[in-house]
Every structure is written in C-alpha cells, then in structure tokens.
Amino acid sequence: TNFSVGGDAKIPIGNALNLDLTFNPDFSQVEVDDQVVNLTRFAISLPEKRQFFTQNDDLFKDFGANNDVTPFFSRRIGVAEDLDGNTIENKIVAGARLSGKLNSNLRLGFLNVLTDADIANEIPSNLNTVFTLRQKVFNRSNISFFLIDRRTTEDFDFISEEEKKNSVTGIEYNLASADSKWNGRAFFHKSFTEGLDDDDMISGMKIERKTLSLNVGMEVI
C-alpha cells in the first residue's frame, strides 16, 4: 500500500499579501476538463482549475499577446512527456506562492514550484519560478515586469545543456482608457537559454478602439 502525506497552508502577511504553501498536493478533486476536439495545428490552452494556481492568477497568466506569445502557462507545471511522447502527470513535490498588494497601486506575484524526477521516463526534477510586479498608472492602465525561470535541480545525464535551464524576462504596458474606448498592449520579452542566442527576443503592440457602433483594432508582433 502506498501511503503519502500532503498539506496546504495559507498565511496572511499584513493586510494585503497572502503566502500559500503546498506539499505533496492532491489534485484528484479538481474539476475535469471539458472535452475539446482540436482540428487545428495549434495547441489548446485549457483553463487552470487547480486552486493553488488560481488565486490572483491574473498576475501570472496575462503575459504576451495571444496563444503564440505566452511565456508562462501554469498548466505546463505538473505534466510532461514520456519516452513515447505521451503526456503524463509529473508529480508536484511542493510549491509556494506570495501574491497581493504592496500598496494601493503596486501588486506583487511570486510563484515557486518543485516537480519530481521520473528517471524511467527521462523527466528531470525542475524548479519553476515566476516573479512579477504590476504598477497601476493613470486611471486604469498598468506597467508589468516579470521574470520566469525553469531549471533542473541536478545534472541528469539524459538532459542536454540547452534543456537544463531557461529564463524569460519582459516588460509590458497595458492600456485601458478611463472611458473604456481605448484598449491596448505593448510588450518586449527576452529569453535566455544556454547555448542559444538566436531568435531570443520578441516584441509586439496591439491597440483597439471600441464604441457602440465601431470596433477597430490593430496588432503587430
């Protein structure tokens, strides 16, 4: 009989910050995903339903412009591919998340999750980290900075140098006019991977004008 112990804790820090901790989490009670038939060549991004990842998740999931520019997607944590290329569960050992407000205009997000190694399927143990700050500007707009990092916890012999660690950092400006007629986003992201120096930057801009009778938009990536 396999016996395992796990637990979760929520620790308030001041009036506006919360520290969430999890050890050996059990997500068996999470709502099952809706069945989706994908007839395109693009991957489907199913919504995150695991409670540990959902609180203040807008701090972590809104980077980029569309499904083609998504530097962080929490559903990737806890899944991996076996030797046959099939998607399998990759056990989460522990995680910590600090999120909330530093003041009325500045929000903080920090996420740190350790996944277990599966030597039989040549899956390494990874430490996944996200750090973000979001500063409100003007009436409804904001500027965000983020750093995303994934690295193996030891030198597994089945992992190449390029796969051992990867980091992405970026800055984004999100426009939302006071009258809700103008919305937009401008971003710049840079990736850092050992041994890879090409195609490691991306930038883009999107702006929309919305009224009751008009909806005009432009996007450049």
Where are these regions (language model features)?
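Outer-membrane beta-barrel channel domains
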Residues: T1-I221
